Amino acid sequence: QGDITTLRCDAIVNAANSGMTGCYIPNHRCIDNAIHTYAGVELRLACAELMGQQGYPEPTGQAKITPAFNLPCKYVLHTVGPIIEGGVTRRDREMLASCYRSCLELAAESSLESVAFCCISTGEFHFPNEQAAQIAMETVKQFMNRNTGVKKVIFNVFKDLDKAIYEKLLRAD
């Protein structure tokens, strides 16, 4: 539990918005703002360049990689999680699983061995915390059972609620 921007690992995961250039609300407490703030303006510029080349908003469930610039990790993996409006649908669950899988696949392709995930979509995007944690754990477990590139996955939680949920799920596993 703690601040993902302080972790020394190969990559941390940013729960981004579809514009991918960070949160533009000053002092906003979202993970996207924290990562872009501590990484420095270079991260925002790198993301803007990626998005300019792409020419359209980042789809939900995919992943992009950038250098981490001023962060202690080496890279930032950016993914856009599903936004929940009303109840969680099967498609929402599939898209959230795709976020985790896409980040892990990109990490493996990039020869990264350690990845730290935040709780994708649970904050500003309103995915229920317990369901999101179950999807995260199951998706990562499935990936790790059949792939050898990524050796260490960290579930970095910020809230006490998420810590309790992950501890419960890890004990049950």
Spell out what each predicted region is:
Residues 1-173:
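Macrodomain-like recognition of ADP-ribose-binding/processing modules
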